[in-house]
């Protein structure tokens, strides 16, 4: 089922980030220090009463005080476009100001569910200006304290009620493909080439935003849906705000896809924006194909192809399993080869490993390369089995997971990956203590 987006919006210093951290139950730093990945942390997967959703913290946006009102308005408009449910946060301890009222006015014009969260409420304060908040005109109104946890459960119950109300279960057996990349790498050209090449468009499904369209088509008797084909249109007046929110659009597409196509421009160096997008794919553990577009514009192709591959591998070490393909979306060169790779990946995802064969591979791996001592002891794996999941997932029962060094985990991943043909997809190893 598609994950819905819940956006927390409001002016600075009303407690958006505190509410974000309270809901996801842990503190997130602004910079996420993963190997090769550094990015603004304005989103997280969240869960309440077994329902999962994507939570967005707009507090990650820095605002130039001279452009304060303009930036607030832009922030609000983008949140409306992206979100399925909006939590509008105001400050109980301070009177409403013009920016609160401006946000409220914009939200009333939208068709999105809005929940008013009146933060910094401690139950002891005299409620002498509650009428101010009621005058904002929102029927869903909750007094909360993100610091002390007051009212958070009731707030999330309301969020989930809107998410559940909007759920529609449609039987769809097509493979969902997200085409992701920074502006002007040729995403739209690739979509057009895929669709026009096959000339078998099944449907165009309007998305939740004005400019998002999912396109379905068939190729070699397989059904495909390219999801979230429209990106946020880059407008100079939006500047960095749009760049940050483009990650939200990308995250939504990645989360709800089966396979991701990460597009880069063959004529330009790889940028932080490229690797940031790669980081989203890594976080979501999605199969990915790196599509190098505009290869027709490159001179000395035979000489340059190895250099480009080396550059890509160096920048995207954390998704080393990704296949790389060089194409020209405009000329339709090798475009259908992408779908052949997608079909191969789908086949790999369906492989089920027999338990006894898996344990033979792991026993052999431990013989040829015993686990190093770590945290005062040595890891010992007793047995393992594959469990049901979209990507190949294996539970390894051991003496204690704390004895696992990350380098040895990578070694075991590689042993499983190449023993069972998982070389082009992510796999997941879960270590559990044997009771």
From Swiss-Prot:
Binding site for GTP 1: 10-17, 57-61, 119-122
CDD domains, A to Z: EngA1, EngA2
Example GO biological process: ribosome biogenesis
Domain EngA-type G span(s) in chain numbering: 4-167, 175-350
A UniProt-annotated Pfam family: MMR_HSR1
Keyword set, alphabetical order: GTP-binding, Nucleotide-binding, Repeat, Ribosome biogenesis
Name by which UniProt lists this protein: GTPase Der
Native source species: Mycoplasma mycoides subsp. mycoides SC (strain CCUG 32753 / NCTC 10114 / PG1)
């Amino acid at each position: 089922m598609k994950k819905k987006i819940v956006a927390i919006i409001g002016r600075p210093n009303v407690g958006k980030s505190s509410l974000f951290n309270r809901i996801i139950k842990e503190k997130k730093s602004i910079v996420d220090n993963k190997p090769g990945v550094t990015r603004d942390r304005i989103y997280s997967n969240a869960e309440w009463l077994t329902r999962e959703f994507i939570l967005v913290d707009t507090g990650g946006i820095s605002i130039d005080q001279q452009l304060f009102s303009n930036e607030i308005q832009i922030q609000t408009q983008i949140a409306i476009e992206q979100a399925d449910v909006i939590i509008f946060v105001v400050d109980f301890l301070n009177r409403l100001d013009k920016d609160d009222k401006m946000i409220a006015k914009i939200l009333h014009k939208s068709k999105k569910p809005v929940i008013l969260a009146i933060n910094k409420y401690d139950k002891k304060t005299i409620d002498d200006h509650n009428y101010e908040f009621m005058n904002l005109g929102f029927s869903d109104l909750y007094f909360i304290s993100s610091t002390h946890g007051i009212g958070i459960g009731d707030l999330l119950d309301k969020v989930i009620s809107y998410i559940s109300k909007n759920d529609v279960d449609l039987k769809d057996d097509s493979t969902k493909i997200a085409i992701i990349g920074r502006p002007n790498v040729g995403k739209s050209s690739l979509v057009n080439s895929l669709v026009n090449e096959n000339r078998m468009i099944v449907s165009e499904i309007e998305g939740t935003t004005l400019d998002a369209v999912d396109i379905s088509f068939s190729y070699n008797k397989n059904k495909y849906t390219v999801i979230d084909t429209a990106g946020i249109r880059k407008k100079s007046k939006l500047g960095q705000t749009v760049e940050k929110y483009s990650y939200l659009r990308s995250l939504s597409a990645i989360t709800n896809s089966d396979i991701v196509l990460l597009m880069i421009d063959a004529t330009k160096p790889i940028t932080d924006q490229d690797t940031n997008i790669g980081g989203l794919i890594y976080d979501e553990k999605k199969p990915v194909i790196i599509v190098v577009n505009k290869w027709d514009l490159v001179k000395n192709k035979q000489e340059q192809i190895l250099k480009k591959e080396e550059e890509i591998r160096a920048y995207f070490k954390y998704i080393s399993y990704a296949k790389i393909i060089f194409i020209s979306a405009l000329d339709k060169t090798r475009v259908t080869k992408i779908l052949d790779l997608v079909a191969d990946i789908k086949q790999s995802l369906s492989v089920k490993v027999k338990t006894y064969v898996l344990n033979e591979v792991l026993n052999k791996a431990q013989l040829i390369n015993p686990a190093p001592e770590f945290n005062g002891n040595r890891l010992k794996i007793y047995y393992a089995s594959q469990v049901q999941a979209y990507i190949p997932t294996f539970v390894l029962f051991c003496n204690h997971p704390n004895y696992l060094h990350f380098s040895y985990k990578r070694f075991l991943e590689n042993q499983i990956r190449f023993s069972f043909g998982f070389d082009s997809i992510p796999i997941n190893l879960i270590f559990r203590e044997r009771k």
